[in-house]
Amino acid sequence: MLQVNLENEIKRLKKDLSRVEKKAVPNAAILSINDTLKLVKAGQQLQMKRKLENPTNFTLNSLKIFEANKKTRSPKGRIFIFRRQEEYIKYQIDGGVSRSVKGGFPVPVDRSLKNRFGNLRRGKTRLFRTKKDFYADINGTRGIWQRVGKDNIKLRIVFSDQNVYNKKPYDFYGTGNRIIDAHFNKRMRIYIAQVKKFMK
């Protein structure tokens, strides 16, 4: 979850405002936070497309915005990932180890089966049901093996009980904070200027 609570930033902006302009700050802050959250959501979806492997619409639509309102002492809003999607997206954000409930994770050993993310290329499982490819547990290694020549075999895919995520390709928090830093103050000044113009 990424929370947008810019109380200190709002206080800093108020120092340079007139008494009339300061009255506009609460509403301007709410509007600015909500505008910025929409930009954060769009930016996160763009990052998903760039950093995740062929994200589905289910993944791209995983973000929920809670808008700022007048109910809190200081305006704040937040954006988070729905729980179902967060169960697998979290490994792309924070890394870690996921454990298989059943069957194991298919991990490609053969480089020809890997995509640019190092994962099994889509559709490749259909290639294993050939005369040369077979499933076996050999010396404790479960996987898809291939017969090479008369007497040799090679491991193409290993089934692992856990998947270790060392890389963290999706910078969820960094992306959100960069967008907030780039856009919030601009929108605050725009809304305050509109109020000032209206009051003249």
Question: Which ranges hold each PLM region?
Answer:
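Short, Lys/Arg-rich flexible segments
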Residues: 1-200
